[in-house]
Structure formats: structure tokens, C-alpha cells
Amino acid sequence: MKIYVPFKPTNPKSRLSKIMSEDERREFAFQLLLDVLDCCEEAVVLSASRDERLRDLKHEVDERDLDTAVTSRIKKEDSAFVMSDLALISKKIVKKFLDTDGDVVIAPGRKGGTNMLLSRSREFYTSYHYGSFLKHVRIAEKLGLNLSIFDSFYASIDIDDESDLLELMLHGKGKRSYEYLESIGFYVDFSEKEPKLKRA
């Protein structure tokens, strides 16, 4: 099973722009990517543009839109796609995901997205963004494919906004992205009823 990790090097994690500079977001996104690659043996980074930092990583540059890039690979062979910001996944989670039966296997995100996707069908195609989980379910059903939903708390957390950073700081000790956030001053304040993300 070929595993791809889609990655966008330019202006990543724009929803964090109020609390992180562009340089910080670029470095953070790269650390997230490395966390994911730590869990996906032999994975290929599917980059939307060229980036010098990918030089020593197995990667392919595909400047087409995400759906075209992903679907073109699904048409060729059994493929899995793991988003590059799933900092909390582990090798065990990825193995369990890859071992799940089905023509199509989807790990949904907390906010309606598709965080991991596996296709053993040449017919399947993707429609990422804007509630992609339900769209992918409908596509699989329309094509008459056997669909499995992969239920994982850690796989459901993709790091996009401040609330996601809080989850990473609560659950991600030992991860590269966690250590980077700590190095630039982020921490969790437990002084109130609910934990809050703070920056020194």
C-alpha cells in the first residue's frame, strides 16, 4: 500500500496567523509533517510546491489541486493519504488503519473533514474541503463501494486553529511539533476551570 502525505509548504496554517508569525507557521507545519512521517514508514510527501526542506525526504511535487493530485494516484494503485497535520497519530494507529477492510476507508476529522483516506478501488475519487467526510461517504455509496469508517480520537485531530493547538499541548508530549510549540513559548494554563492555551 502506497502512503502519501499531502503537504503545502507556502503560507501554511494561515488560521494561526493571529498567534504565530509566517516563519513560525512554516516551521511548525514542517515539524507536524515530520511527526506524521515518524508514524508512516516509507511514506511519500506529496508537496504542492518545491521546498528545499524536502530535499532529504522521499517526496513528489504535484502543483495540481489536491483532488486532482490524489485522485490521479488512486486511479493507478491502492493508495492511502494521511494529512500532514495529524501530530497525535502513532505507528499503531496507522497500521490499524491500513489493516481495516473495505474498498474505501475513511478516518474523519472532528470538524467534518477527511483526515486519513484509503482506497483499494480505481473508481473512487476525492472531493476535499468543505465537509469532505460526508462527500466522500456519498461518493463511495454512489459507486457501490464497500466503505469502512475508522474511529480514532487521535486521528480525528488535525491541527488548524487555536483549539487544536490546545489538544496538541494536552496530548502531544514527546512529539516534534509539541516541542516546537514549547520552544516558542506556548503552554497550557490550568489555573481556571477549563485548560487554556497561553503564550509566554
Curated annotation (Swiss-Prot):
Protein name per its UniProtKB record: 2-phospho-L-lactate guanylyltransferase
Organism: Ferroglobus placidus (strain DSM 10642 / AEDII12DO)
Quaternary structure note: Homodimer.
Reaction(s) this enzyme catalyzes, per UniProt: (2S)-2-phospholactate + GTP + H(+) = (2S)-lactyl-2-diphospho-5'-guanosine + diphosphate
Disulfide bonding pattern of the chain: none
GO molecular-function terms, A-Z: GTP binding; phospholactate guanylyltransferase activity
Keyword set, alphabetical order: GTP-binding, Nucleotide-binding, Nucleotidyltransferase, Transferase
The organism's place on the tree of life at top rank: Archaea
Function comment: Guanylyltransferase that catalyzes the activation of (2S)-2-phospholactate (2-PL) as (2S)-lactyl-2-diphospho-5'-guanosine, via the condensation of 2-PL with GTP. It is involved in the biosynthesis of coenzyme F420, a hydride carrier cofactor.
Family per similarity comment: Belongs to the CofC family.
Pathways involved: Cofactor biosynthesis; coenzyme F420 biosynthesis
EC number, UniProt record: 2.7.7.68
Taxonomic classification: Archaea, Methanobacteriati, Methanobacteriota, Archaeoglobi, Archaeoglobales
UniProt-listed HAMAP family: CofC
